[in-house]
Amino acid sequence: MKTVTEFQNKNILVLGIAKSGYAAATLLQKLGANVIVNDGKPLAENVLAAELQAKGMDVVCGGHPLELLERNISLVVKNPGIPYSNPILVAAKEKQIPIVTEVELAYRISEAPFVGITGSNGKTTTTMLTFEMLKEGQKHPVIAGNIGTVACEVAQDAKENEVVVTELSSFQLMGVELFQPKIAAFLNLFEAHLDYHGTKKEYGLAKANIFKNQTENDYSVINADDADVMALSAYSKGQKVLFSTTKEIEDGACIKDNALYFKGEKVVEVGDIVLPGQHNLENILAAMSIAKLLGVSNKAITAVLKRFTGVKHRLEYVTTINNRKFYNDSKATNMLATEKALSAFTQPTVLLAGGLDRGNEFDDLIPYFKNVKAIVTFGQTAPKLVRAAEKAGLDTIESVDTLDEAVVKAYAHSTDGDVILLSPACASWDQFKTFEERGDIFIQAVHKLI
């Protein structure tokens, strides 16, 4: 960990606890700050808050009183999930108090360089692929961010010869000031999180923060097939490395002659890749580009791609019952992810979908229903999904209250050779704490059928 003195004796407000807030508060105390921790949940229900209080921190729970900002606050470190429209953040901004997220702290203390990966879809898969390729290539990666350990915990122990590989959301990237990844990858942009950002434009600009401090000594890995990403790459001063699944890229990554190429050199045959789905070729090209930029050999990259079958909750094969294959794609929290999941199968498919209503309609899914024989909807968006299914002319459309019911109904509507796919196209927070919990409940419900 770097020697950092900028926080000593400063009053710093950590807003929202959870894992990242707990880690940030603990780190700041270690760095000599006077830490004030604030969380909306009452102290009696807040185990982490009680632990921080026991460490000697000033902990205020049960709301976000504006009076906290009268304590000569030098910096606010916010939980990514707390929107900037929250009154305490609006007031902090008016007072010109800097507002950052925990990943910014991680960067400031880390001796190791960062690789940052963002995009609407494919972040987790690309992050895991990158980690595995760097590990196989003996580049000493450590994984942090939305997957793995909280970034500022990892950064405390990361050494100069290591690489911190981070999956970064728009929520996290809105709160960076100095964050400068050695390599920044922007995979794609799809209309999402409008309840948080308001517009696709603002959402895209938040993502583009991954580029804002890069220099000509850094690299920006960019999806040449995504017009929005290409436009936002103008914010990068780094060396641009493009990847594409549709056209040849001489100075980047592409597919030609049924193989993956990087800067004109064949790296791996498509036939050696075990990860299913056409969309995953984009993720592989991005990860491969990062690995090659960091000096990983073709042999190491190929070894990973011959064994890497995917990440949990992302087109995860669950089991086969009476020749019906079940897949858990609970991480599909928006339409684009579900479109890609549906495109991965040619068999008749029974789709389970639904979740938190963020204001979207689902007509964009209609062209992808060509192999969908039945849909079972649940959650807040069930009526909207039913409307889209009716427009698509599906014969079998059902709505149920719970995911357990949805699994039973989906199996009842299936026949020999079908795929039964959970790909919700929505966030999980209307009925579940996380998409992981939703996926686990789906898997449990499937096993009850056996």
UniProtKB/Swiss-Prot annotation:
> Would the keyword Translocase turn up in this protein's UniProt record?
no
Name the UniProt key words of this record, in alphabetical order: ATP-binding, Cell cycle, Cell division, Cell shape, Cell wall biogenesis/degradation, Cytoplasm, Ligase, Nucleotide-binding, Peptidoglycan synthesis
**One GO biological process term:** regulation of cell shape
Q: Which InterPro entries match?
A: Mur-like_cat_sf, Mur_ligase_C, Mur_ligase_C_dom_sf, Mur_ligase_cen, MurD
User: Which EC number applies?
Assistant: 6.3.2.9
Name the family the entry cites: Belongs to the MurCDEF family.
- The answer on whether this UniProt entry bears the keyword Transcription regulation reads no
Localization per Swiss-Prot or TrEMBL: Cytoplasm
What GO cellular component term, any one, is given?
cytoplasm
Q: Which Gene3D superfamilies match?
A: Mur ligase, C-terminal domain (3.90.190.20), Mur-like, catalytic domain (3.40.1190.10), NAD(P)-binding Rossmann-like Domain (3.40.50.720)
Which purpose does this protein serve, as stated in its record? Answer: Cell wall formation. Catalyzes the addition of glutamate to the nucleotide precursor UDP-N-acetylmuramoyl-L-alanine (UMA).
Q: Which HAMAP family does this entry report, sorted A to Z?
A: MurD
Task: Report the superkingdom from the record.
Answer: Bacteria
State where ATP binds: 119-125
Gene name, please?
murD
EC supergroup of this enzyme: ligase
Instruction: Name the catalysed reactions.
Output: UDP-N-acetyl-alpha-D-muramoyl-L-alanine + D-glutamate + ATP = UDP-N-acetyl-alpha-D-muramoyl-L-alanyl-D-glutamate + ADP + phosphate + H(+)
* Protein name stated in the entry: UDP-N-acetylmuramoylalanine--D-glutamate ligase
Q: Name one GO molecular function term.
A: UDP-N-acetylmuramoylalanine-D-glutamate ligase activity
UniProt pathway annotation: Cell wall biogenesis; peptidoglycan biosynthesis
